[in-house]
Amino acid sequence: MEFTASPKPQLSSRANAFSIAALMSSGGPKEKEAAENTIKPLEQFVEKSSCAQPLGELTSLDAHAEFGGGGGSPSSSSLCTEPLIPTTPIIPSEEMAKIACSLETKELWDKFHELGTEMIITKSGRRMFPTIRVSFSGVDPESKYIVLMDIVPVDNKRYRYAYHRSSWLVAGKADPPLPARLYVHPDSPFTGEQLLKQMVSFEKVKLTNNELDQHGHIILNSMHKYQPRVHIIKKKDHTASLLNLKSEEFRTFIFPETVFTAVTAYQNQLITKLKIDSNPFAKGFRDSSRLTDIERESVESLIQKHSYARSPIRTYGEEDVLGEESQTTQSRGSAFTTSDNLSLSSWVSSSSSFPGFQHPQPLTALGTSTASIATPIPHPIQGSLPPYSRLGMPLTPSAIASSMQGSGPTFPSFHMPRYHHYFQQGPYAAIQGLRHSSAVMTPFV
């Protein structure tokens, strides 16, 4: 049985305009055009730091379009090697064209730029490091200027960090742009004389990923690349506030070495190390693991002395003498001593006749000779000390036999908490409760 395809019904021109095929064919160019109008790549503005761009030409400031001096598109002369003014509909005056801006911390920024600068963003806001610090020249000493800063996306891409390659890779299209904000330097307006004598530091700028931020922080998307920009505006005498700058003249300065990737946690470990080493406020991260061997040894010895001096059970160090006639010393961090001139059988037979131990005198500080510690029952064997475990418990004969073999005990040393739950009844009562029934009973010395 043969089937014949029925002819498709003919649609009118008006109905054909609303068909699925027509909507799909017309939707592509519109979406692409909308995306281009929403996020314009700023790669041409990043290549040269000495080029100036009018503030109102970039879509990152659409929300503050009144700050601009014109809405024309940037011309091909925006890529330049000298501080020239591009041929835009509104050309700044000769006074603004003479103004030059230099990045004070360029050497530090270059170090980060080689590795790929990353900036942390948080809900509450995080300050930038390195900080944007600039100085101006060519300004009129008698005029007043307003210095601003903003951060715009470099491109319309989202990035991810490839750990196996130690590099950033494109992960897809950028997230929807966040509200653009201008950061006005709190000391503005400056006089030209002030700008010639001092640098302008944006150390109080904070970056956040909180879209509902009400503190004036700059809102950024994580895993996106951004370019900070510095703007200088000449303030007219008739300007009452910073909100009315529609007719002001300005210049914009971009430094390509300040490009960074916004992250919620550092991806490159080299960036983390460089920030800790370069940031004077990161001293808290320079722990003992970053010290030299000599410094680390002194720190560890101080920690060890502190824990020993405050330990509820006295542990003997290498400075401790185990008896008036004994010359045996201990290595630091061990509470064990063995007798080299006494056999195991004679030691067990001698120790089995010891009565129950009594409470000794209070513990003394580290380094005090054991001769000053009163012993209620003197030990019959001079020059030796029964082995004790880390908790101060006498070891079993099997443990003693294993410790007597070789050059000496090699028991590991672990730091115990100062107030363990076993010591709530007193250290010696707790030891009695922990002692095995077959353990040898010996007094403390």
UniProtKB/Swiss-Prot annotation:
Ranges where the record places region Disordered: 318-337
Protein's name according to its UniProt entry: T-box transcription factor TBX20
Chief location: nucleus
UniProt cross-references to Pfam families, sorted A to Z: T-box
Chain's role: Acts as a transcriptional activator and repressor required for cardiac development and may have key roles in the maintenance of functional and structural phenotypes in adult heart.
Chain intervals with Polar residues compositional bias: 325-337
Coiled coil feature spans: none
GO molecular function, one term: RNA polymerase II-specific DNA-binding transcription factor binding
Disruption phenotype: Embryos die at mid-gestation. The heart tube of deficient mice does not elongate, but anterior and secondary heart field markers are not affected.
Compartments it resides in: Nucleus
CC annotations in GO: cytoplasm; nucleoplasm; nucleus
DNA-binding region(s) from the entry: 108-287
Listed InterPro entries: p53-like_TF_DNA-bd_sf, T-box_DNA-bd, T-box_sf, TF_T-box, TF_T-box_CS
Gene3D superfamilies xrefs: Transcription factor, T-box (2.60.40.820)
Gene that this sequence comes from: Tbx20
BP GO terms, sorted: aortic valve development; aortic valve morphogenesis; atrial septum morphogenesis; atrioventricular canal development; atrioventricular valve development; blood circulation; branching involved in blood vessel morphogenesis; cardiac chamber formation
Alphabetical UniProt keywords: Developmental protein, DNA-binding, Nucleus, Transcription, Transcription regulation
Tissues expressing the protein: Prominently expressed in the extraembryonic mesoderm, developing heart, eye analage and motor neurons of hindbrain and spinal cord. Expressed in extraembryonic tissues such as the amnion and allantois.
